[in-house]
Amino acid sequence: MTRIKRGYIARRRRTKLRLFASSFRGAHSRLTRTMTQQRIRALVSAHRDRGKRKRDFRRLWITRINAVIHEMGVFYSYNEFIHNLYTKQLLLNRKILAQIALLNRSCLYTISTEIKN
């Protein structure tokens, strides 16, 4: 029976893995078995946090809008403000409202007084 040499396939796979794990700390960037485990863990975390990022930003936008509304003293709650937006059929999402709240508070004040009436 002739000898079969493994070739470069396994080396190429480990090199690719090593490039992925090169920024990891300690044995996680040196040992092949822990590299594979950390790679799986990193990809799982990345997948989970892509969804979490959306929730976090929405939470941040709501907090900013609520803070500016209370600061202006419109006698509003955030809940009423959003409800009035929907009843008046204004197509402003929370991201846009948060940007307006940061950059142009007087504009948000006029929007809130207009939809309240």
From Swiss-Prot:
| SUPFAM superfamilies listed in its UniProt record | Ribosomal protein L20
A single Gene Ontology CC annotation of this entry is: ribonucleoprotein complex
Its predominant location is: plastid
Name any one GO molecular function.
structural constituent of ribosome
GO BP, sorted A to Z: ribosomal large subunit assembly; translation
- According to its UniProt record, what is one Pfam family this protein matches? Ribosomal_L20
Sorted alphabetically, the keyword list is: Chloroplast, Plastid, Ribonucleoprotein, Ribosomal protein, RNA-binding, rRNA-binding
Subcellular location per the Swiss-Prot or TrEMBL entry = Plastid, Chloroplast
Could you tell me which CDD domains the record lists for this protein?
Ribosomal_L20
Domain of life, source organism: Eukaryota
Q: Which family does it belong to?
A: Belongs to the bacterial ribosomal protein bL20 family.
Q: What is the recorded function of this protein according to its Swiss-Prot or TrEMBL entry?
A: Binds directly to 23S ribosomal RNA and is necessary for the in vitro assembly process of the 50S ribosomal subunit. It is not involved in the protein synthesizing functions of that subunit.
Alphabetical list of PANTHER family matching this protein:
39S RIBOSOMAL PROTEIN L20
> Matching HAMAP family, A to Z?
Ribosomal_bL20
This protein is called Large ribosomal subunit protein bL20c
Q: Which organism is it from?
A: Lobularia maritima (Sweet alyssum)
